[in-house]
Amino acid sequence: MKKLSEAEFEIMQVLWQHNEPVTSNQLLEEMGDNRNWKLASLMTVLARMAEKGAVHCDRSTRTNYYTALVSEEEYKITEGTSILERLFNKSAKDFITMLYQSDRMSEKDLRELREYLDTLENKGEK
């Protein structure tokens, strides 16, 4: 799937929150606080997202219903891998170093990361 714009990502976040198809009016209502969109603008972005393979539009009824074709987890993996490859030469260590040096990691984050790595080590995983 092609990379999503910030606006497309915001739409996906709303779709991921729902376990059922969502109408464009529902999307517009739920995104109202974030963006001051008109319905036509939203429809244009949704059409672009469908072309990218991010959403499916069910047109079998009078009202169009939209569902995410990519799970939130799949998108995070794709984007995270892309960032790691492009910016950090595939080095998780360099990525973590950047987070730490830029004060993006709290003591709690560090503790949780240590616990996670210990768990992986105890299981014999990567």
Predicted regions and their residues:
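Short acidic, hydrophobic short linear motifs in intrinsically disordered regions
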Residues: P21-E30
